[in-house]
A protein has these predicted regions:
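Short amphipathic, basic-aromatic surface patches that mediate peripheral association
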Residues: 43-47
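Short, surface-exposed beta-strand/strand-loop-strand elements in extracellular ectodomains
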Residues: 49-67
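Surface-exposed loop/edge segments in extracytoplasmic proteins
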Residues: 10-14, 65-76
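C-terminal interaction-tip segments
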Residues: 1-33, 48-55, 114-149
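Solvent-exposed, conformationally flexible loop/turn segments
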Residues: 16-23, 79-89, 97
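Beta-sandwich interaction modules
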Residues: 89-123
Length: 149
């Protein structure tokens, strides 16, 4: 049976990635009028160029402080050891689409509503990358996808 994922639905999703290196890969590609709640990101270091090479996760999206589009908002950077794992299980949410741009820092209810409305189709995307091209990480990300279209 197919999973219903139309307007008004909420589903749990899980994405798996193997042998990820220093190239930034999207873990979750946002869709306008969706809200994503990340439940966990599990990272395992299979191979490292050097002990202590980092694993990093960041969101590319709208900066509500600087009122700028397409900005990197860092979630975590973790130094890793070969055969070691890191579990990020602090829940956080992000909108699938960027808001209509506003001037300056978000400082009003109107600005806050613009962020929630996601009136621009520019995607906000959660990324992962390692420190070095020789690094290899396996990643599992589990999240809730709320479709408010």
């Amino acid at each position: 049976m197919a999973i219903a994922r139309g307007p008004g639905t909420e589903i749990i999703r899980c994405h798996n990635f193997e042998d990820v290196n220093d190239t930034g890969i999207p873990l979750i590609v946002g869709v306008q009028h969706h809200i994503y709640t990340v439940l966990s990101i599990v990272v395992h270091a299979d191979v490292l160029n050097a002990a202590g090479d980092y694993a990093r996760c960041y969101l590319v999206g709208y900066d509500s402080f600087g009122a700028a589009t397409g900005q990197r908002i860092y979630i975590f950077r973790q130094d890793m050891q070969v055969a070691g794992s890191f579990v990020w299980n602090d829940k956080f949410s992000f909108n699938g689409g960027e808001p209509t741009d506003f001037s300056g820092t978000m400082d009003s209810e109107a600005d806050q509503n613009l962020i929630s409305d996601q009136a621009v189709s520019t995607s906000q995307t959660l990324y992962f990358n390692g420190e070095h091209s020789a690094d290899r990480f396996d990643i599992v990300v589990t999240f809730i996808d709320q479709n408010n279209a």
